[in-house]
């Protein structure tokens, strides 16, 4: 073989290798089923520069103008405090991914995401991921998307299962030192889909005395709930455990091949919305933080409730937190002085017609004690009281006697016919 032929063969081989490399780059999922990606794609460059200080200026280029309007309208005091907060989201699936997106759009300071699953095409009916992210870890794909949504948010991701011993210790450490100031974080949001992970979050938060919120959606996708959990003050997840947890059943044995839980993006969004709204109220101290909110999509029923801690809870840290909370309440000073606000007298400058407002909720002394007209009504006349001491006028007495005589006569005739 001549040198010229060898050069042509090498050239053709190089071209084939280059074409093969381009195909792998364009279609990374078309590799063998046993191969695993050795690296994650880099995060996309943010579309704008970071904003150092929030502004209430109403311009199209200000992504925070609508949020700062809450402060201008008196709903929230100092909305910019949200940039100081750190929230951990455990589970970035149907609820967790939407929660992370909402908090990112709200301008949260830092998000810490925990999940060990990968994005699948089957997830596209309910998650905010895109089909081209299939095969990537959920936390990495979420970070790439969220950074593009709001580059001001600091996002930390952990691609592991928190229920293993080593990973659980890391999870506890991030609760303890994961904030923007390397201190304790502000809140943990549980958005997982299994009881084992919920128990792990519950154990960690009881151990660290960390306030957290739990959420879930039913397997039939038409109901869900959120729950605010403050160790010692409210019931933890182990205080009122589900039947599967209380019975000690391995929930993995309950799953059947070929059978999956139903999933609706509407239910996921409703539960995520409730969870984020409760989170904002807690972090920014406005409104009322709900302890428990349920959701039934079939009847649009939203029950609210509060659950007290169980004094016989199996979690030793929960019992310790209950004791600490009881001591805290007992040591609080009792304020016996109750200030009664003075009623302000409304003064009208002009009252041309002499109109006066009266309280009609209680009957006046002039009204009958036996009859009550009700709120907003009054008698047209006062009913005459009839008793033994009532004196009748001559006309009334004559009428009374006449009616009595007729009655007596009818009775007498009836008796005669009976004989």
Swiss-Prot record:
Tissue: Expressed in the intestine.
Family as reported in the entry's similarity comment: Belongs to the ubiquitin-activating E1 family. UBA5 subfamily.
Gene from which the chain derives: uba-5
Biological role stated in the UniProt entry: E1-like enzyme which activates ufm-1. Required for interaction between ufm-1 and ufc-1.
Entries under PANTHER family matching the protein: UBIQUITIN-ACTIVATING ENZYME E1 (PTHR10953), UBIQUITIN-LIKE MODIFIER-ACTIVATING ENZYME 5 (PTHR10953:SF9)
Active-site residues per Swiss-Prot or TrEMBL entry: 260 (glycyl thioester intermediate)
Residues annotated to bind ATP: 94, 115, 138, 161, 194
Gene Ontology CC terms: cytoplasm; cytosol
GO molecular function per UniProt: ATP binding; metal ion binding; ubiquitin conjugating enzyme binding; UFM1 activating enzyme activity
Segments for region (Disordered): 18-47
UniProt keyword list: ATP-binding, Metal-binding, Nucleotide-binding, Ubl conjugation pathway, Zinc
Disruption phenotype: Reduced egg laying and lifespan. Delayed larval development. Enhanced resistance to pathogens, heat and oxidative stress. Reduced survival in the presence of cadmium. Inactivation of the ufm-1 cascade.
Binding site for Zn(2+): 236, 239, 313, 318
InterPro entries according to UniProt: D-isomer_DH_CS1, ThiF/MoeB/HesA, ThiF_NAD_FAD-bd, Ubiquitin-activating_enz
Organism: Caenorhabditis elegans
Name the record gives this protein: Ubiquitin-like modifier-activating enzyme 5
Subunit structure: Interacts with ufc-1.
Biased composition (Polar residues): 30-41
GO biological process: protein ufmylation; response to endoplasmic reticulum stress
